[in-house]
């Protein structure tokens, strides 16, 4: 591992940020918010029940604001120095790279291929890497694409390393034409050749997608005969085995295709179960001490990504900081994901300053020993396993009870825990053992998914697993390099994006009610108080109910002639509070290079997600708690870079998206997710119409008077935030509100108006 010589410079540096001005802003916002709530309480008797409802909603918003402030209070980052690893090149550990996929239709094979090719081409010794692709759909098309990709990789990987290309996903690299100013004849020739070969690869994959009979001509595909996505045996195939030596830049890493056994009457635990199967198979074949987990729609955008993670893991292990994993910031090449990037940049750094970032499911380098259930207390100062842990973990009966009855698996676990050198075995010799650990019943009565590996009982397996790791006392590190380490694609279209947000929120809320969830670990002394608050951020999804109510309150007050906002001085406090919040969030966007329009669009997106996806996630969890239905892991449809739908020519991070922002290309379908937004817009239109013609009822307030200009401005602001739904009322086709949605929303709006007037 890392050289222990103190004369060597540090591999990484932890940077803590202290901005007293921002802290003053946080405290000012909280102070104004608290004074507004006090005013609500003191004058409740002077107004009707609207003030009580407003107090409830604003109290929820205050708690969320307080929670976010606690997390942002002491941001931190980690700066790696990958160039310094060259002094320790012989000490670099092996890394197993996991790429899970499940559906060749919703996750196109060429997209999976691009991700794999980008990982194969990273700046790291090829004989130290192994790429495992888990295909939960058992698709011959995915396997075919992987085989063809392995042939192209023999051209692509040497090309990338020879010319030190920055982007190593071919679909993204070849979007930009070769520079006319480039006079290097050899480079031009190699560039043209590599591009031609990549286009051949794409055509082969596309042809095979359109004609599945092409796959039947090869004997290698006989194993896929009579297989179904949810009914098939375990498949383990070595696509390519690296047999080269150290420093051979023409070699490519191992490529292994796996698909675990699936039967209709067995629970498979979705992606989480696939990740645990990847952990077992890789343990049997290569057993690298570190694991890089990347979603199939996220490619490596920085060639030094593995080296950056190693800087932290090797440095942390040297100083015994108990670092369990390194999480990279999740970024996208789509032009509609500014909000996610901003949240991760500011909130992610804040959490990194506590016990470490939360594992977000992709772009993360794990330590295998940690994933096998060990805690920092199980190790001595020098990093060796303690005598107590040795007796507990390495006894044969204990190993079988925890990891299953496979002798080969138990041996690999012992080697991984003790950090024994992994001999360069022939991969094909481990195929039978790998198939054994892929059986449906293998995990039965073991600790897989409970305390070992990726944890079950939630569709948000990343958050569940992260809680389990931190509750054992581990820390984690956050890297936010200037060049995004990984870039991914958001789901194709607004309906798919809202569906993904609904799935995420469902998993987050589900953790609150899980009997087997490691959420109980939040009360462990090994997890810091503010880190507990970081995980309790999942309750922000529950604010969708007060958010929906608050969007309707101005309209209700106009119809009912009630007062929502305070008068005089406290109206000024309310306006000041909103103004400071807007200026602060605008600064967050502009500090990352985004425009004012990007900020405006993101404010609208945030409201839409909160009142649609998050709202229906609460409905999903309610049905589960009542025993009516179970939560379902939904695979969202992904787009391929370079296609029109993928916004391949769209701006990168920090660029202005211009007037053709996705806000003005809001696509509708018949999904119920569009119902709340349409309903909100119709209600506010009706309220403004009633107010403008003076058809309000007489005020029943005691001393507060009726509604006025402030409530009308509130309605206008709500409609501005839901502008896509307002525009959808006047458009046709996919950019217009479907008649079914409009009819239901209109009926509900009429009921709301009738009972409000």
From Swiss-Prot:
Tissue expression notes: Expressed in young seedlings, primarily in the vascular tissue.
GO biological process: cell wall organization; cellulose biosynthetic process
Transmembrane segments: 18-38, 50-70, 533-553, 569-589, 615-635, 674-694, 710-730, 737-757
Pfam families assigned: Cellulose_synt (PF03552)
E.C. code: 2.4.1.-
GO MF annotation list: cellulose synthase (UDP-forming) activity
Transport keyword on record: no
Family to which this protein belongs: Belongs to the glycosyltransferase 2 family. Plant cellulose synthase-like B subfamily.
Main function: Thought to be a Golgi-localized beta-glycan synthase that polymerize the backbones of noncellulosic polysaccharides (hemicelluloses) of plant cell wall.
Protein name, entry field: Cellulose synthase-like protein B1
Native organism: Arabidopsis thaliana (Mouse-ear cress)
Gene name, Swiss-Prot/TrEMBL: CSLB1
């Amino acid at each position: 591992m890392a050289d222990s010589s103190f004369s060597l410079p540090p591999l990484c540096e932890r940077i803590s940020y202290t901005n007293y001005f921002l802290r003053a802003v946080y405290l000012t916002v909280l102070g104004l918010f608290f004074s507004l709530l006090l005013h609500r309480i003191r004058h409740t008797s002077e107004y009707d029940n609207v003030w009580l409802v407003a107090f409830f909603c604003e109290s929820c918003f205050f708690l969320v604001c307080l929670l976010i402030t606690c997390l942002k209070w002491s941001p931190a980052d980690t700066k790696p120095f990958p160039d310094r690893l060259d002094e320790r090149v012989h000490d670099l550990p092996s890394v197993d790279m996991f790429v899970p996929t499940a559906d060749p239709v919703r996750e196109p094979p060429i997209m999976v291929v691009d991700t794999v090719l980008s990982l194969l081409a990273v700046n790291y010794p090829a004989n130290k890497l192994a790429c495992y692709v888990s295909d939960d759909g058992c698709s011959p098309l995915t396997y075919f694409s992987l085989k063809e990709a392995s042939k192209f990789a023999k051209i692509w990987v040497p090309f990338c390393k020879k010319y030190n290309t920055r982007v190593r996903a071919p679909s993204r690299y070849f979007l930009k034409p070769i520079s006319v100013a480039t006079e290097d004849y050899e480079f031009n020739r190699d560039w043209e050749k590599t591009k031609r070969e990549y286009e051949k690869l794409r055509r082969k994959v596309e042809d095979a997608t359109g004609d599945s009979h092409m796959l039947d001509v090869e004997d290698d595909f006989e194993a896929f005969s009579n297989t179904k996505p949810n009914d098939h045996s375990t498949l383990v195939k070595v696509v390519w085995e690296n047999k080269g030596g150290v420093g051979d830049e023409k070699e490519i890493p191992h490529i292994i295709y796996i698909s675990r056994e699936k039967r209709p009457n067995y629970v498979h635990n979705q992606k989480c179960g696939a990740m645990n199967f990847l952990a077992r198979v890789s343990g049997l074949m290569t057993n690298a001490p570190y694991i890089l987990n990347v979603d199939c729609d996220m490619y490596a955008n920085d060639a030094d990504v593995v080296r950056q993670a190693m800087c932290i893991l090797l440095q942390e292990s040297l100083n015994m900081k108990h670092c369990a994993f390194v999480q990279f910031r999740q970024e996208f090449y789509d032009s509609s994901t500014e909000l996610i990037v901003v949240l991760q940049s500011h909130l992610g750094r804040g959490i990194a300053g506590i016990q470490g970032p939360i594992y977000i499911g992709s772009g993360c380098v794990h330590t295998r020993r940690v994933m096998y259930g060990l805690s920092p207390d199980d190790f001595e100062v020098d990093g060796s396993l303690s005598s107590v842990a040795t007796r507990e973990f390495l006894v044969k009966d204990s190993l079988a009870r925890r990891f299953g009855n496979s002798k080969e698996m138990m041996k690999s676990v012992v080697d991984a825990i003790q950090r024994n050198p992994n001999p360069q075995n022939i991969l094909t010799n481990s195929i039978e053992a790998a198939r054994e650990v892929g059986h449906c019943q293998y995990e039965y009565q073991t600790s897989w998914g409970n305390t070992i590996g990726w944890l079950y009982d939630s569709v948000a397996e990343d958050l569940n697993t992260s809680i389990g790791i931190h509750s054992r006392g581990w820390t984690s590190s956050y890297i936010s390099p200037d060049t995004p380490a990984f870039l991914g694609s958001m789901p194709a279209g607004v309906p798919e994006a809202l569906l993904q947000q609904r799935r995420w929120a469902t998993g987050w809320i589900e953790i609150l009610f899980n009997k087997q969830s490691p959420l109980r670990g939040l009360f462990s002394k090994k997890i810091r108080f503010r880190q507990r608050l970081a995980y309790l951020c999942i309750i922000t999804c529950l604010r969708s109910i007060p958010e929906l109510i608050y969007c309707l309150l101005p309209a209700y007050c106009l119809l009912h002639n009630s007062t929502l906002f305070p008068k005089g001085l406290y109206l000024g406090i309310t306006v000041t509070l909103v103004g400071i919040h807007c200026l602060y969030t605008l600064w967050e966007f502009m500090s990352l290079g985004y425009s004012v329009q990007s900020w405006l669009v993101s404010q609208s997106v945030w409201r839409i997600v909160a009142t649609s996806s998050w709202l229906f996630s609460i409905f999903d969890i309610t049905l589960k708690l009542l025993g009516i239905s179970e939560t379902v892991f939904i695979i969202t449809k992904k787009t391929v870079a370079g296609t029109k739908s993928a916004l391949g020519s769209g701006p990168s991070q920090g660029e202005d998206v211009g007037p053709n922002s996705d806000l003005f290309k809001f696509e509708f379908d018949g999904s119920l997710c569009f119902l709340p937004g349409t309903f909100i817009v119709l209600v506010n239109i009706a309220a403004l119409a009633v107010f403008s013609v003076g058809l309000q009822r007489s005020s029943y307030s005691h001393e507060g008077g009726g509604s006025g200009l402030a409530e009308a401005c509130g309605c206008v602001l709500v409609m501005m935030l839901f502008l896509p739904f307002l525009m959808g009322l006047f458009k046709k086709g996919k950019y217009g509100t479907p008649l079914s949605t409009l009819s239901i929303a209109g009926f509900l709006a009429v009921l709301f108006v009738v009972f409000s007037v």
